[in-house]
Amino acid sequence: MALSGGMDSTSLLLRLLREGYSVTCVSYLYGQKHSIEIEKAMENVERLQSKEFIVNHKIIDLRSAMGSFHSALTDETFEVPEGHYEEVQMKQTVVPNRNAIFSSILYGMGLSISQKEDCNVTIALGVHSGDHAIYPDCRPEFYNALSTAFQIGNWNSEKISFELPYIEGN
């Protein structure tokens, strides 16, 4: 699962553990200004591990690839806007192709785990309907198309599925 350290992905992690999943979390450093979330992700995983939950955590550094993407979240030349989540100025926080990149990495990891361990793998993401207005890569049609592309482009895709429990609700 993708674990940003924010509220959505952290609640998803807790849900997956409650449902009995063996969880590997992946956090991404991509040049984001709000790296405090990565620190919170690490703290939360450490706390869960101290309570005997089996949670693995990997941090993948994509700063050299994504750090120059034009977005208020990554570009030092403009401020992160404040305001209501659905306001137009919040579109400045879109990082081009971010969820496709993250999902592609997770999918490759899932295929590798599936092949090594001869098992099915679920890729879980905390994207939710509240993100739809601002982030086009948080919409159901995006993930349907992405899943189709991954299935067409990879062998053994029948062993991989996406779990997007919040995509239709808040």
Where are these regions (language model features)?
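ATP-dependent adenylation/nucleotidyltransferase module used to activate substrates
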Residues: 1-170
